[in-house]
Amino acid sequence: MTHRKSAFELTAAEQNRFLQVITAMNTDNDPTLYAQFVGIHADMRHHMHTGMGGGAVGRQRFLPWHRDFLLKFETAMQQIDPAAFIPYWHWSTDRALPPWLAEFNFTVIVPATDMTAPQIVNVIRHPQLDGLPTDAQISFLETNSRMNYTQFTGVLEGYHNTVHNLVGGTMGDIMISPCDPLFWMHHAEVDRICSIWQADPANQGKRPALSPIHAILDPWDPDTVDTVASITTLGYDYV
């Protein structure tokens, strides 16, 4: 079982492990393993995973697709260091960027996709974090069992979009946002919130409204929205 911890509660060794592993992922091949993950996220013509780019289908796939995306990335991390994990940025409580990440400079050579040309991305941020979602808003969402899945994912994706925009810079560009290591911590927090809502017995059985073909989480066929429904089954939790 992998235990994902808050980015603000990592030991110095855990901080260094995360940075060392993603650096190793970004120095292996051409394109690097890290850049390949960025390319998957950017290829939204084939991998609808957001309401912004995929309409109703993308909105329904947003949470399960990114859950699988993070799991695949974390698995790749653990092939380099079995003790590695993706920390989460609890932005409604820790209303600042993780300080140990601030001095870390990162550059990714992003491969071309059908929608983007190849580019060199030097990660930058322009944080204006006063408007981050609040603890009260997130607590209300996590405990709101009156919502159906469509309502829940719509609200959570909206909060997610707000965080991307308030961090700014690389995170503010949906096509290249995974170049910023903060992306993984942000989406781990989104996934953590989702897992809390899913754990409420009143929400059991609430699932994305998708046809069988759209329920397949490409490019990871045969993964589907149902095979990633439980983080316990997937082998990780949030602590």
Q: What does each model-identified segment do?
A:
Residues 1-239:
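C-terminal accessory segments of proteins
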